[in-house]
């Protein structure tokens, strides 16, 4: 993986006769910069990735979606499949497997980001269920924190509870949704469509990233999610 020197190059302008930069920033470049930044600030990975990806999209994605004609004609050619194909194309352009095969650190950071997202999503869901049952969430948080620590996630312990440093939104799903919503904004007005596209993005990201876990010691996202669900079910059953 290339050394991260893009920021220095973009701002090092000392002469008035500097020619315009010809190199075009790609989705792969943006992703590589964001995932490498995890080494210094893993907790901000998903946010920074989404911001940079969206910034790139604003300057790179064509704003024209349909040729001029009747409104019904434009809508007829835009389907859910069109949006999903676009997200798949964006995911492929990131070349996650290719980058991971060249850089072990990149591969591990990718796995850490995925497991941290699984931790965050399932923690929030399970905590809501426990609270609705009148069950204290502190023992649950402590136990899933231990599970996250045993899985090899970096983080810190506060008040006896371990929390992964990168807990938050999935750093791979967010850019795909952002890209598609910018290119096809009208397809994201309906809530059911939003849910459908998010589920599809999660599905293709999971399929793309899961093979990376087979080469390491960390549990797969599916295994880690099952661990958290089993812990939650134990507390829910005790509350019944």
UniProtKB/Swiss-Prot annotation:
Cellular component annotations (GO), alphabetically ordered: extracellular region
Entry's localization field: Secreted
GEF catalytic domain: annotated segments: 78-240
Name this polypeptide is given: Guanine nucleotide exchange factor sopE2
Domain of life assignment: Bacteria
Transmembrane annotation, as ranges: none
Functional note: Activator for CDC42 by directly engaging this Rho GTPase and acting as potent guanine nucleotide exchange factor (GEF). This activation results in actin cytoskeleton rearrangements and stimulates membrane ruffling, promoting bacterial entry into non-phagocytic cells. Chaperone InvB is required for secretion, translocation and stabilization of intracellular levels of sopE2.
Signal sequence annotation: none
GO biological process: actin cytoskeleton organization
Keywords in alphabetical order: GTPase activation, Guanine-nucleotide releasing factor, Secreted, Virulence
